């Protein structure tokens, strides 16, 4: 979420657009944000064509497309005109390439607590770990840009002042009931807070997110040491911030432009 935000901030600055309303940053995280609703899954929010020509009244959906273009580069290694269906554990996307060396450790980690996990599922979880720790790699950018405070301000701005337009745009793009979209905004306003996000901007916070997501919380000391080593290795596997810069260049070259 914060990598997406930081990257869009960079793109807006590079485009010379300084005063956009902050709701664009909620559009930008919408494909992930919408999945907090129990009736909306990630396949629905990610499986749309990347270059839909939106009518003027729905022009802010361009920032949703920005998110999907970033995901394509992270997951597949290139931008696709259409959604790539099916899961490939051998994907050449950045997060899968970086995560590949973690797969065996992830399988061993689950064995410690008596849980079975397939190679494919371990590969999927490896890319999530890379995504989780990448926020820490670019933490200096996030702090310098005020990305965390921006997100908190943006969710309240969207809910309070742009809720009708946001709900209508999401409904147009995805066919999701506007009442569900408004529920998502209300739920998001309660957890996208600077206080909460600051608490998870470290290895320990990322481990908590991972264990909560996959039901792995336990008091096993061997597990605790193993998962700490796993996340430290993930962080060490990312040598620099090249993905951030290369992604910005690739998306500019494909013709994506801010709509303000």
Q: Which ranges hold each PLM region?
A:
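N-terminal leader/auxiliary helical segments
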Residues: 1-260
């Amino acid at each position: 979420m914060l990598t997406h935000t930081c990257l869009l901030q960079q793109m807006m600055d590079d485009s010379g657009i300084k005063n956009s309303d902050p709701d664009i940053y909620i559009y930008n995280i919408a494909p992930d944000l919408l999945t907090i609703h129990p009736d909306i899954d990630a396949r629905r929010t990610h499986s749309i064509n990347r270059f839909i020509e939106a009518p003027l009244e729905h022009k802010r959906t361009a920032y949703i497309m920005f998110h999907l273009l970033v995901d394509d580069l992270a997951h597949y290694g290139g931008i696709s005109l259409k959604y790539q269906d099916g899961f490939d554990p051998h994907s050449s996307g950045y997060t899968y390439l970086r995560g590949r060396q973690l797969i065996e450790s992830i399988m061993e980690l689950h064995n410690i607590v008596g849980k079975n996990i397939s190679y494919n599922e371990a590969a999927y979880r490896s890319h999530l770990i890379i995504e989780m720790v990448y926020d820490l790699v670019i933490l200096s950018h996030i702090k310098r840009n005020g990305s965390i405070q921006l997100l908190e301000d943006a969710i309240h701005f969207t809910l309070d002042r742009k809720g009708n337009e946001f709900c209508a745009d999401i409904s147009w793009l995805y066919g999701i009931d506007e009442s569900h979209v408004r529920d998502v905004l209300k739920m998001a306003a309660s957890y996208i807070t600077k206080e909460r996000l600051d608490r998870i901007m470290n290895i320990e916070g990322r481990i908590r997110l991972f264990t909560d997501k996959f039901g792995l919380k336990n008091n096993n000391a061997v597990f605790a040491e193993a998962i700490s080593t796993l996340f430290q290795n993930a962080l060490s596997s990312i040598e620099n911030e090249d993905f951030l810069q290369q992604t910005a260049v690739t998306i500019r070259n494909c013709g994506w432009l801010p709509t303000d």
